[in-house]
Structures are given as structure tokens and as C-alpha cells.
């Protein structure tokens, strides 16, 4: 089984948290709301990977003013590829508390939507298991 280390920013701006809705046809959590983030590439440092993933998925214009390592978790997930293939992967999630100076987001093709969500509204979103676990651990659910 393949192993992946995933960096996940929990991005907050003015009391709201950034959630991204995954594309319906790909990824580990198709069609569900999640934190952004992605895999650490060979030879890449953890914070470099986090900043790269944010640029790739959320755009250059989202400015982070704070990045603080927070917690980690792991599990086994089935990834669905655009061509329909499936793969089981052992996932290690490194989760960071982040604060952004703005809400200027430009999502890439991995996502179909995004939202800045106040903690009291998180229950109204179809969150994937990993995001639900993270937000519960943070005391937001």
C-alpha cells in the first residue's frame, strides 16, 4: 500500500474557516467539503509543501499571516481517479493552524466551490470524515 504525507491548512479569517468542495469525479472525498491541502513531494520541506499546495489550490493572492503546526492524524483512504481507477492509500495528515490576511481565493480544478464558514454554520456542510474529525478536535463541531 502506498503511503502519502498530506499537509492540511486550517485557514481562518475574521472568525470564519475556509472549506473547499471537492470535485464530484475525483479525489479521496468526491463531492464533499474539505480542507485544502495535498501531498509532500520527495525532497520537499513540510512548510514548503504547505505553501505550494495553498498556491496551487487556492491561488497566489491568498495571503497567510500565520502558520502554526497544530496536530496530525492518519487513516487509510480509497482514492478515485478521474478515469475511474481506485487505490487504497495510507494517509498521514499534518494539520496547520493558519490565519489569512484576506479572503481572495481562486480555486483550481480539484474543487468545485469554496466557502468561508463561521463555526456555528459548519454543521450545515457535508464534511468529509477527516475534516469532521479535525474540526471536532479543534472544538468547532
UniProtKB/Swiss-Prot annotation:
Record's catalysed reaction(s): a ribonucleoside 5'-triphosphate + H2O = a ribonucleoside 5'-phosphate + diphosphate + H(+); a 2'-deoxyribonucleoside 5'-triphosphate + H2O = a 2'-deoxyribonucleoside 5'-phosphate + diphosphate + H(+); dUTP + H2O = dUMP + diphosphate + H(+); dTTP + H2O = dTMP + diphosphate + H(+)
Motif Nudix box, residue range(s) on this chain: 38-59
Essential cofactor(s): Mg(2+)
Pfam families, per database record: NUDIX
Gene Ontology MF annotations: dCTP diphosphatase activity; dTTP diphosphatase activity; dUTP diphosphatase activity; magnesium ion binding
Domain called Nudix hydrolase: residue spans: 1-141
SUPFAM superfamilies found in the cross-reference section: Nudix (SSF55811)
Family, similarity comment: Belongs to the Nudix hydrolase family. NudI subfamily.
Protein name from the UniProt record: Nucleoside triphosphatase NudI
Phylogenetic placement of the source organism: Bacteria, Pseudomonadati, Pseudomonadota, Gammaproteobacteria, Enterobacterales
Amino acid at each position: 500500500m502506498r503511503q502519502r504525507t498530506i499537509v492540511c491548512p486550517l485557514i481562518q479569517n475574521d472568525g470564519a474557516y475556509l472549506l473547499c468542495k471537492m470535485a464530484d469525479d475525483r479525489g479521496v472525498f468526491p463531492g464533499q467539503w474539505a480542507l485544502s491541502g495535498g501531498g509532500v513531494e520527495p525532497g520537499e520541506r513540510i512548510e514548503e509543501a504547505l505553501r505550494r499546495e495553498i498556491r496551487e489550490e487556492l491561488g497566489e493572492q491568498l495571503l497567510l499571516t500565520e502558520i502554526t503546526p497544530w496536530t496530525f492524524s492518519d487513516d487509510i483512504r480509497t482514492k478515485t481517479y478521474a478515469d475511474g481507477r481506485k487505490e487504497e492509500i495510507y494517509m498521514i495528515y499534518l494539520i496547520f493552524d493558519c490565519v489569512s490576511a484576506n479572503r481572495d481565493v481562486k480555486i483550481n480544478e480539484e474543487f468545485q466551490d469554496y466557502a468561508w464558514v463561521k463555526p456555528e454554520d459548519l454543521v450545515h456542510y457535508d464534511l468529509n470524515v477527516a475534516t469532521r474529525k479535525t474540526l471536532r478536535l479543534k472544538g468547532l463541531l
